[in-house]
Structure formats: structure tokens, C-alpha cells
Amino acid sequence: MESILSLLRGMGIMHLELGQALMMLISLVLLWLAIARKFEPLLLLPIGFGGLLSNIPEAGLAMSALESLLHQGSAEQIAIIAAKLNTVADPVAIKEALANAVPSVQNQLEVMAGDMGYNAGVLALFYKVAIGYGVAPLIIFMGVGAMTDFGPLLANPRTLLLGAAAQFGIFATIIGALLLNWTGIISFTLPQAAAIGIIGGADGPTAIYLSSKLAPELLGAIAVAAYSYMALVPLIQPPIMRALTTQAERKIKMVQLRNVSNREKILFPIVLVTLVALLLPDAAPLLGMFCFGNLLRTSGVVERLNDTAQNALINIVTIFLGLAVGSKLVADKFLQPQTLGILLLGVVAFCIGTASGVIMAKFMNKICKHPINPLIGAAGVSAVPMAARVANKVGLEEDHQNFLLMHAMGPNVAGVIGSAIAAGVMLKYVSALM
């Protein structure tokens, strides 16, 4: 009888908490959105499944070695960790002290937990390698670069301004997050506000990379918000685009783009990364990998590497990245008032980015000889190529002969560059204040 009771006590369901059950439900919703609604399935499916695994009681798949010790360790072992942190031997107090400890102390305690026989879960290992070291977002950026054509941007360089204008949503959202903190509604630090703001760039890898550096505790919510809003581009953008433009503006036909030589396409990524990296070294990792991937494409001499970068490699890394992000969808980190603030600020950032791109295009029409259809300004957010397709679709609704797709790809690609530079700016100046 005792063995049966022991078996029952060891079942995960006997230790299931309300928060874990709720997070498992949220993970199932993400899986439903990915499979049934096809909302960013390449990321939301592994994120949702990773979240499901992370919240299985007693499995410890998303726990580090130290977290496993705090969850399963003896009183003596917990007391040793508490003494190192000068706090009481209570797991809750230890976690609070850990959050304020310097990285060197955290690493030392992780090693101690490993020496005591505790190991990190598989999802925690994925997170440490893929996101903790910043590897996965950078490799994905390389793959995106290999799939990107700079031709439309080079054929119409002024669309760089549209991509730059769309980044206004990022900085406006940082101000919004700090205002929420100042009013006492929701508490956000400056690094957290910067990490949330990058959602406005509609660039998932950049959002993950920046939040892993500035606010890793918010990474799960930021990643889910970023990819969810990217999937909702066809729903979020059109009402804003129509509200800010007249019917006549939406019917503007742009001049045919010139042919861009292969030499220009080869030189552009080299010149771009050199200039930006010399001026803003913190943007070099993201932009460097993006430009390297593009050079694989345009050089025409490494077709095997180009094919691997934009297919097999990016697909493999996407799996590990999604599962790693899912490891952060645990109840004690996700079910916080900050999560609601992130979701609200994220959609505000996206809307402001869309609107600022359209408004910039309208302003440019006042001073430029050749008119720009303001709809392509909305493509300045870096959801490639979804935002460009939406601009083209809205334009075709007004005039069935007005094809804007290639024109919209210019600001769309500029948005990717802009979001990487914005991330570099925040890494440089926010990190200096931390």
C-alpha cells in the first residue's frame, strides 16, 4: 500500500499548481494559433510546445541546475546556497537575492549546484546555448539576409527614410513603458522598457536578441508578443493605413524601378556593415550577420552556403530557438502584471511604427519630385515580406492595376536594417546606464 501511495505522490499531476495549469492552457492556445490559424507557425509551434513541456510538474525540463537544487535539494544544500548570498535559507528569498546578484556569483552558484549532482533540464540547456550566448537570433538573421534582395532599396534609396521613420514606434513605446512606471501602474525599468520597445520593429530575432541582453526575465512575453503581432500584420495595419491616407493617395502609381547591377548588390552589404559598425559597434553582431547572409546570396560563388543558410540552417536553429523561448513560459515568470503591459505596449508600438511610416511618406510627397504611394510607408516595419504584401493588397483594392509589392520591399528591407541599428543604439546607451 505504501508503495502505491509513493507512486501516486510521485505523479506530476499531484504537484500541478494553478499557475502551471494556466500556462499549459496558454501554450495549447499558441499551438492552436500556429496549427489551425497558421499564425507564424514556424516559431509559435515550437514556442507553444516548449511552454507545454516547461510547465509539466516535477519534470524540470526548463530548470537550471541551481533551480533544480532549490526545488529538490535538502535543507543543508539550500542553506549553503543561502549563505553564499547572505540571505535566509528559503527558496523564495534565495531567488530574490539571485535576481540582484552579479553574473559572476550566479555562475559560481550554478557550478556549485552541478557539483552537488544537479543538472540543467534540456530546455534550459537549449536556452543557454541558443539565446544565452546570443547564437540563435544571429544565425537566423544570417538566414534572413540570405533570403533578402536589396534591389528595391538600391533602386529607390529614399525608401530608407521610410524604414527609419517606422522605428519611431520603438522609441515611443520606451517612453510609454517609462510613463507606466512613473505613474505606478506597472513597474518597468529602463532596460525592460527598451526591450519591450523593440517589439515595434516587428522583428522577432531582434526582439529576442535585445531582450536576452537587457531583460531576460521578460523574454518569453516579449517573444510571444513580437511574433503574435507579426502574424497579425494583415489585421492591424490596413485600418491605420486607410485612416491616414485619402483614396487619391492610395491610388498613386509609382515610377518603374530601375535595374540594379550585381556589383551594387555586392558592394552594398559590405559598405553598410562597415560604416554602421565603425559608428555603432553594438549593432555589428546583428547587422554583420544579416549582411554576411546577403553577401552569400549576391556573390554568386557560394551557392551551397547560400542554400544552407536560407534553408537547412535557419530551419534547424528555428527549432531550438522556439523551444528555448518556450522554456521561459513558466508560470512564475509569465503570469505577472508586466506581461499584460508588454502585450498592450507591443500593439501600441506596432501601430505607431505603421503610422509613422505612412506619415513620413506623405511628408516626402511634399518635397519630392516623384510621388510616393504612402501605403508603402507602412512596410517600414521589418515584418518581411508580410508588411510589403499588405501594402500591395491595400493598393490593389483601390486600383487593380497598381502593383506596389516591389516598391514596398524597399522600406521593408530598410526596416530590418533600422531595427538592427535601433537595437544597437539601445544596447550601447541602456547598457551603459545599467
Swiss-Prot record:
Question: Could you confirm whether the keyword Cell wall biogenesis/degradation appears in this record?
Answer: no
Q: How is this protein situated with respect to the membrane?
A: Multi-pass membrane protein
Name any Gene Ontology BP term: sodium ion transport
The cofactors required by this protein are: Na(+)
Q: List membrane-spanning regions.
A: 13-35, 122-144, 159-181, 186-208, 223-245, 266-288, 308-327, 339-361, 403-425
Tell where it localizes.
Cell membrane
Catalytic activity of the protein: oxaloacetate + 2 Na(+)(in) + H(+) = pyruvate + 2 Na(+)(out) + CO2
- The main location class comes to membrane
Q: Which Pfam families match?
A: OAD_beta (PF03977)
One GO molecular-function annotation for this sequence?
decarboxylation-driven active transmembrane transporter activity
A GO CC annotation recorded here is: plasma membrane
Q: Which family does it belong to?
A: Belongs to the GcdB/MmdB/OadB family.
In UniProt terms, what function does this protein have? Catalyzes the decarboxylation of oxaloacetate coupled to Na(+) translocation.
Please describe the quaternary structure of this protein.
Answer: Heterotrimer of an alpha, a beta and a gamma subunit.
User: What name has this protein been given in UniProt?
Assistant: Probable oxaloacetate decarboxylase beta chain
Q: What species is given as this protein's source?
A: Pasteurella multocida (strain Pm70)
Taxonomic lineage from the root: Bacteria, Pseudomonadati, Pseudomonadota, Gammaproteobacteria, Pasteurellales
